[in-house]
């Protein structure tokens, strides 16, 4: 909702929920999510080999595999999914920020990126499915 509302002023929250459910119904999305969550869980349990354990536990900025896994989701909806994801990864609104800054033994190195990817893909799906409803910022200036 947060990503697409400025471009689709009449957007309803229920449309966003439907779009998220559609994204979550895809096998590729399932595979990315279960892989990322499993890696986060194994990291919490200290079961990865070094140096991977340290890298994932610290969410090292140059690791990037967490973003690569997220790209497998956003790429389902083309360049708009990709740019939406970049925006969400940068500003980290709402739950994405909470997941990214979680402490106390929890590892969300992959989860925050996967949640952002699902949101970005759902926003991209809305834009692709309703191109006539999308308000273009350049056209309005």
What do these predicted ranges mean?
Residues 1-40:
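N-terminal interaction modules that seed assembly of large macromolecular complexes
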Residues 3-4, 35, 69-82, 117-121:
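Short, hydrophobic/amphipathic alpha-helical patches that form generic packing surfaces
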Residues 11, 15, 24, 64, ...:
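Alpha-helix boundary/N-cap detector
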Residues 34-52:
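Short, structured interface segments that constitute the first stable element of a domain
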Residues 48-85, 90, 94-98, 104:
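Phosphoinositide system proteins, centered on phosphoinositide phosphatases
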Residues 81-141:
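Glycine-rich, aromatic-bearing surface loops/beta-hairpins
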